[in-house]
Amino acid sequence: MGRGRVQLKRIENKISRQVTFSKRRSGLLKKAHEISVLCDAEVALIVFSTKGKLFEYSSDSSMERILERYERYSLSERQLLSTDPDPQGNWSMDYPKLTARIEVLQRNLRHFVGEDLDPLSLRELQNLEQQLDTALKRIRTRKNQLMHESISELQKKEKSLVEQNNALAKKVKEKEKVEQNNRAQWEQQNNIGQNSSAYVVPPPPLQLPSLTIGGSFVGRAVEEDGAEARPSPNTLMPPWMLRHVNE
């Protein structure tokens, strides 16, 4: 006999309901994965348990990308079909979707920091790992780019400082060379002045009068031809010699 049709109604037994939810959830996630792989389709599956626990599945692309695509599509469809001139009606329709999106973003944020990972299946953990790996690669690429830019900027500053240092050193050398030339010229002029003053003819010595035996002063005349001075004929004789002469 064939299998009878199962009547769809709420399972009253709590334990049976939890077991059925776990089995059907696993089968639903499996079917979503199969259709994603076999048909190359973007699939997003969101399931909330009776306790409010979230279970989800997304294909290789992230859940946020699929939801954004769905929102754009649904928004364009509503704009084409909506005839309500009151925008508040649209706001009331968008509020539940925005609330659901906020919850998804908050949950993904917790997953990215390593929290609330128990409800995730192996496939979901693999998707999360791939997303984190991709994010880390982008972060490392950006970090390396910034480091290379910083190193290049420092090299440019170093080159500029070296050029400035060389220019200052050149100016200092030129200034020292000018000072050396000025000092050499000054010393040369000083030596020339000292040598010229060494050849000046000294003045003749002053001739002083000489004292004779008789007590009279007789000056010495210097003749123009360079002859020696002669004694003066007006030399006085003592009285005792005069007496003998008169005799």
Curated annotation (Swiss-Prot):
One biological process term in Gene Ontology: positive regulation of transcription by RNA polymerase II
Keywords: DNA-binding, Flowering, Nucleus, Transcription, Transcription regulation
Record-annotated MADS-box domain positions: 1-61
SMART domains linked: MADS
Gene3D superfamilies: Transcription factor, MADS-box
Primary localization class, coarse: nucleus
GO molecular function annotations of the record: DNA-binding transcription factor activity, RNA polymerase II-specific; protein dimerization activity; RNA polymerase II cis-regulatory region sequence-specific DNA binding
Region spans: Disordered: 224-247
Cellular component terms (Gene Ontology): nucleus
Tissue: Expressed in tendrils and flowers.
Keyword Transcription regulation attached: yes
Location of this chain's protein in the cell: Nucleus
Domain K-box: 88-178
SUPFAM superfamilies found in the cross-reference section: SRF-like
Function, in words: Probable transcription factor involved in flower development.
Annotated PANTHER family: SERUM RESPONSE FACTOR HOMOLOG (PTHR48019)
Protein name per UniProt: Agamous-like MADS-box protein FUL-L
Taxonomy of the source species: Eukaryota, Viridiplantae, Streptophyta, Embryophyta, Tracheophyta
